[in-house]
């Protein structure tokens, strides 16, 4: 099934934890790799600092079911800084997941509702309730 989904991971001091996810790994449930986004993108300098807080990935197939559980299980140096933003093809906006009590948990966003559709989407669809 062809379907687009974008995932952004924001986390402090997580370069070592995220680095393996920037390389192909046949043992993972998904095959795409995260791309590191360092501060050179924002500064326009072409060279970034050693610290990176942001990684992005786009899925073009419905093949990333294990991603959120995998991210939850990583040994994050600062779990309170971890934010995972997910935008599925049918979503009105990005959904936000954060680690609470060791679990990657969706944070309810104002004026949104998530409808689960396991046969269509990994996370369901996130719709704005304030649309006209």
Locate the predicted segments by residue:
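Short linear motifs in intrinsically disordered/low-complexity regions
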Residues: 14, 26-28, 39-40, 71, ...
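An N-terminal amphipathic alpha-helical segment
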Residues: 19-46
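Short, extreme N-terminal segment that most often corresponds to the first beta-strand
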Residues: 1-29
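Charged interaction segments
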Residues: 43-132
């Amino acid at each position: 099934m062809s379907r687009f989904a974008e995932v952004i991971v924001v986390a402090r001091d997580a370069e070592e934890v995220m680095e393996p996810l920037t390389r192909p790994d046949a043992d993972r449930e998904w095959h795409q790799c995260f791309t590191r986004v360092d501060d050179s993108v924002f500064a326009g300098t072409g060279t970034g600092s050693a610290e990176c807080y942001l990684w992005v990935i786009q899925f073009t197939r419905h093949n990333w079911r294990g991603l959120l559980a995998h991210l939850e299980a990583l040994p994050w140096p600062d779990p309170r800084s971890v934010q995972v933003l997910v935008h599925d093809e049918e979503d009105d906006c990005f959904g936000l997941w954060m680690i609470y009590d060791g679990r990657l948990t969706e944070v309810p966003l104002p004026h949104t509702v998530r409808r689960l559709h396991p046969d269509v989407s990994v996370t369901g669809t996130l719709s704005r309730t304030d649309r006209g």
